[in-house]
Amino acid sequence: MAKVVGIDLGTTNSEVAVMQGGEPVVIPSAEGSTLIPSVVAVNKNGERIVGRQAKNQAILNPENTVYSIKRFMGRKWGEPAGRELPVEADAKRKPYKVIQGNNNEVRVVMGDKDFSPPEVSAMILQKLKSDAEAYLGEKVTEAVITVPAYFNDAQRQATKDAGAIAGLKVLRIINEPTAAALAYGLDKKKDETIAVYDLGGGTFDISILELGEGTFQVKSTAGDTHLGGDDFDQKIIDWLIAEYKKDQGIDLSKDKTALQRLKEAAEKAKIELSTVQQAEINLPFITADASGPKHLNIILTRAKLEQMVMDLVDKSLEPCRQALKDSGKTASEINEVILVGGQTRMPLVQQKVKEFFGKEPNKGVNPDEVVAIGAAIQAGVLKGEVSDVLLLDVIPLTLGIETLGGVSTALITRNTTIPTSKSQVFSTAADNQPSVEIHVLQGERPMAADNRTLGRFMLDGILPAPRGVPQIEVTFDIDANGILSVKAKDKGTGREQKITITASSGLSKEEVEKMTREAEAHAAEDSKRKEEIEARNVADNLAYNAEKTLRDNKDKIPAELNTELESKIAAVRTALQGTDVDAIKTTTQELSTALQSVGSAVYGQQQEQGAPAQEEPSAEGKKNDDEGTVEGEFREV
């Protein structure tokens, strides 16, 4: 049975895991690490690179290196931001170019092309898929992907689109805190109530769950999709810019290369300050003026960092209060607090969580790996590899429609267990009204204009009647992924209209299919390029070894073989100057054959020149330790 992988598609880093022998295993990348930076770039040669390699070249190529793309998933220019930073403001913080596309969707520029956020996320997913296939030795076509619990419908749909573009059938979208709870509670036997405090690179979630007898029931969830490690880094960056401007009179915020260096230095200092009291930020040649090169050297203490980010940590506690209130629990009723996300390693975060819940947080899970592990467990549940587990998740935001006066009328309130369905009867607002527009909304605000529009559709053919008489039944259906379908039916005529909110990510079905084809084509190009590089490396190494053999054994190689070998080496060198991979492979094979002939000739000459005969074994079957030929295994390096 084909394996289904679990993927934690993170803002800063991503991971992939799988069930093996009944246990979840985090899969290492081709580079050897389980954490893959969520970074994509197009280098100066026009090549697309992903992960650690992309992150390593970011300083030299800031304008074509995209990071934190998750913050733009499912977002549009000019939409109500709620707790989130408006797209326009977030775009200004990035050294890469963020532009407004058709229908106000977000696009990012790399090289000479612009891409949608799902396309960029798909590149990260393709890297994870490729690493998983290399590890498992088989094709991977299905996945469970995690999202922040507080992601709205558009952000969830954008994640599904990214999976499709990457060539993955997304069996389930699962909330990150719920995945973490699965990983924590799979082998727990006792009933308990837990809080999952998930502060990652770009998002914050808090979920309250009840665990018992293999059932994981989410009671409430709250969060902020624009609060995470990126914001902590930004505080340090802003401080460094201000300090440098005060000291040197130079504004580093205008220099994209300097900004990228500041970002990396800020992240490094922040991580260091989780274990030490002060960190030195030393950036030589950060900029230059008329007097010559300028350097940056500043000491940042843990105390200063905590002052800078205190408001961010406090900001995470408001959703915690909301989640407790919605669950009907008090802090004292929480048995365990699970910390998830790399930012929870910060001592200040741990201290604040301890003070809020009145207990020491549980540090028994790896905050970086626990979400991917939970996703793999959910994949195992869906495939029947894991039994006796029931997961009951909830929707994070209220769903409703616009009614008379621009009011948002709720049909399904937040924290309702999914999958679910809810119907409600509405009527017309005017006499003889022939049609109604169903304006589908998501959010907690009382007025429609302040909430997010998920979709609109018309129900026509309503029979003439006084206002308030026609009965229009509106039904909301939410599947286990939290994806919404809406149906409107005129009970008088039986006329019906329905919509599945699939384009709320900003991409139509046709666009997703087109991007999928492009991604497949690019994967084929990558494979071809890799094949060419490997062929070139083999050819170059073989030609080098052949040249060395000629130099070292010139007096031992017969003249005709010498000439043939020189000819074959020249053929390989000529092929390497071109782009024909088949020619490189053919000439390499011919050179290999010629080299074997030379080897046989040299060894034959040595034997003819009187090599001592091999002694027969004695009656006891023994022979001298240093005699005879020892067969061994050799491998190409």
Curated annotation (Swiss-Prot):
Pfam families: HSP70
Coiled coil location: none
MF annotations from Gene Ontology: ATP binding; ATP-dependent protein folding chaperone; unfolded protein binding
Residues where Phosphothreonine is found: 203
InterPro entries the record matches: ATPase_NBD, Chaperone_DnaK, Heat_shock_70_CS, HSP70_C_sf, HSP70_peptide-bd_sf, Hsp_70_fam
Induction per the UniProt record: By stress conditions e.g. heat shock.
Compositional bias of kind Low complexity: 604-616
Residue span of region Disordered: 600-637
Keywords, sorted A to Z: ATP-binding, Chaperone, Nucleotide-binding, Phosphoprotein, Stress response
Superkingdom of this protein's organism: Bacteria
Function description: Acts as a chaperone.
Cited NCBIfam families: PRK00290.1, PRK05183.1, prok_dnaK
Family to which the UniProt record says this protein belongs: Belongs to the heat shock protein 70 family.
Record-given protein name: Chaperone protein DnaK
Organism the protein comes from: Dehalococcoides mccartyi (strain ATCC BAA-2266 / KCTC 15142 / 195) (Dehalococcoides ethenogenes (strain 195))
